[in-house]
Every structure is written in structure tokens, then in C-alpha cells.
Amino acid sequence: QSFYDNYQIAKDVFDNIDLDIDVKKLCFEGPLEELSLTRNTQPCMVAVAVVATKLLKENGIAPDYVAGLSLGEYSALNAAGVLDDQTAINLVRFRGQAMERAAAGIESKMIAIIGLDRELLNEAVKEARALGVVSIANYNCPGQLVIGGEAEAVTKASELALEKGARRAIPLNTSGPFHTELL
């Protein structure tokens, strides 16, 4: 909210979003339960990214190249001028709604696994598949992988990963098994 309070660019972005939800209110006031819904989180995150990009550009910092992972692809396309602000926000609102519909009725979980080799995590995942769908969903960087799928299988895979030497297993606040074969 401090960007909104202090920079006209932020006011322009948030005040001109035309969506079926009040993005500004959700970002600044919540409630967290509503903001955490994928259909709401995604347009809010892209709106903040649009503001950040515009502020950087206003201060002479423009990207030579852009890239994004998952939701970040839309922010990258906006930063590159491929998608205008409203189109990017509309697309991710639709994307979030579609993801929620696809995940409805699936008891799912995602957990970040820290400090374990990919091959060892693959072993844990394969063993846990006896309980349901689980897979490595994100390769964030060496030593930081995310598993996702059906809750029971993901929990088991994380327990096995810890037994195999993972330093930590961090449950993620997600509303679906993103980047898995379930979604």
C-alpha cells in the first residue's frame, strides 16, 4: 500500500483495473482468506508486478530480457510490452478461476523440499506413489524442489525426503496441486 500512497503510477494502475473484484481493496485490506484464493491471488500479484515494473522503468531501469515461471510469465509478458496491464490482469483472473475449478474436490498439498538431491527426492516420490498421485512440481534451484499432488502421498513423500537427508520440508499455502498431472 505504501507504493499506492506515494507513487502516482501505483494509483493509476490500481485505480484503473477493471475486474469483477476490487483488486486494490483485496491487496490492501484483505481479508487474507479471500486474497489467498487462487482466482484472487493471481490478479493481485500481477497488479503489484505491473506497478513494480512501471516504477523501475520510470527510474531508468528497463529489462533487456524477461522471463517468468508460471504466473510470472504474465508479468514478464507485460514487462516486455506483449500484454497491456488490463489484458495481463484479465488473463490471470481467468487462469486462477480455471485452476480452482480444475482442483475442486482434490485433497491436495504442495511442500518445498530443501537440501535434498533431486535423485533422492525422486526415490521418495516413487515410493510415496503407492498412496496416490505425487510428483516433483517445481525445480526452483539446486537444493530447493517442490512436490505436489494428493495430500496423503505428498505428506509421505516429504517424510521420506526428510529420512533421506532433506534439511526441511515446508508446506506451501496453495489451493491446488499446481504443476502436477492433477492440474
What are these model-predicted stretches?
Residues 1-67, 147:
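Helix-rich "cap/lid" substructures immediately adjacent to catalytic or cofactor-binding pockets
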Residues 5-8, 75, 140:
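Compositionally biased, intrinsically disordered low-complexity regions enriched in proline and serine
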Residues 19-24, 30, 80-183:
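Alpha/beta catalytic cores of group-transfer enzymes, especially the acyltransferase/condensing modules
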Residues 42-112:
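Gly/Ser-rich oxyanion-binding loop with an adjacent helix/lid
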